[in-house]
Amino acid sequence: MNTIPENTIVVSYITGDTLKIRVQGEDLINKVTYLGFVHSCSFMTKMVENEGDKIELIRELVKLDALFLFGYGWYPSEVMAFYKEKGLYTGKYKIISWSEPSHYQIEEK
């Protein structure tokens, strides 16, 4: 399993109506709980009713310096690029990728 940086939020899934994140750090756990996320196994999840609610929740996660998981297809990094291309999200965000389980790279887009 990949090492997650201390005191971070890693967004693992944002394609459907449920957002799935992994959170390290008690302060951030409290903040995302306030946003409505609940524990589900090793993740925290939150369901949204529509695309507008999802975009607003993504904005809140970006304010908390969340890292969007890099990958191809409908990984969070690609979904964010799609939202930017369509004008649904403006602004910067960060993606995280791993070259090996304990070595990660963070990039701002």
Task: Give the role of each language-model region.
Residues 1-109:
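Accessory DNA-engaging acidic/polar modules
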